[in-house]
């Protein structure tokens, strides 16, 4: 464990509702940057930011479409780099909420897992052996691909 974590006091931010600087009704990275001094002055030395990756937002950003790109509604990849830089200037740390347990059905990995041919993505998601099978306790979406089987979902059909 990193040494700084022993004394970390986290301020959790859901970017969508935090601070809107461009008037579109949605919080953004610039809005977080604007409030860093306030956050620091109130005694926090770390930020835990809820999902900010590219997403169709079927589940508040937890249905990630691309882990390498930030959600455009919050800003650009350059904007988030600036947010990290501004945190570091204030001796603050920032952690991003990463949800590796599921992705959006629009994620490239899921799309590749939908192919009928076996590939490196075939087993990255839970699929039944045929479209009619539904194991007890597993919600499934059927008929979404050429693959024979139904995809198991964690929460919503969008993930």
Each model region followed by its residue ranges:
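Conserved structural scaffold segments of CAZyme catalytic domains across common CAZy folds
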Residues: 1-33, 37, 41
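Alpha-amylase-like alpha-glycosidases and glucanotransferases acting on alpha-linked glucans and related
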Residues: 2-10, 14, 60, 104-159
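Hydrophobic faces of well-ordered beta-strands that scaffold small-molecule active sites
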Residues: 9-12, 47-49, 94-96
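Active-site beta-loop-alpha junctions enriched in small/polar residues
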Residues: 16, 52, 99-101
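The substrate-binding groove and active-site-proximal loops of carbohydrate-active enzymes
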Residues: 16-29, 61-77, 159
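Glycan-processing catalytic domains of CAZymes
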Residues: 28-36, 40, 78, 84, ...
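Aromatic-lined carbohydrate-binding/catalytic grooves of carbohydrate-active enzymes
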Residues: 38-82, 92, 103-104
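Hydrophobic or amphipathic alpha-helical targeting/insertion segments
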Residues: 83-111, 115
């Amino acid at each position: 464990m990193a040494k700084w974590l022993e004394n970390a006091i986290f301020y959790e931010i859901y970017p969508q509702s935090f601070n809107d600087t461009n008037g579109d009704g949605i919080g953004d990275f610039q809005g977080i940057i604007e409030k860093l001094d306030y956050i620091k002055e109130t005694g926090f030395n770390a930020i835990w930011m809820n999902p900010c990756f590219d997403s169709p937002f079927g589940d508040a950003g937890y249905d990630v479409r691309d882990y390498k790109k930030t959600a455009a509604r919050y800003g650009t990849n350059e904007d988030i780099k600036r947010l990290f830089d501004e945190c570091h200037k204030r001796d603050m740390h920032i952690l991003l909420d990463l949800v590796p347990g599921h992705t959006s059905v629009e994620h490239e990995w899921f799309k590749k897992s939908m192919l009928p041919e076996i590939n490196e993505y075939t087993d990255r998601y839970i699929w039944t052996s045929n479209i009619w099978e539904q194991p007890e306790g597993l919600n499934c979406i059927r008929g979404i691909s050429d693959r024979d089987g139904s995809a198991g979902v964690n929460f919503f059909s969008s993930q």
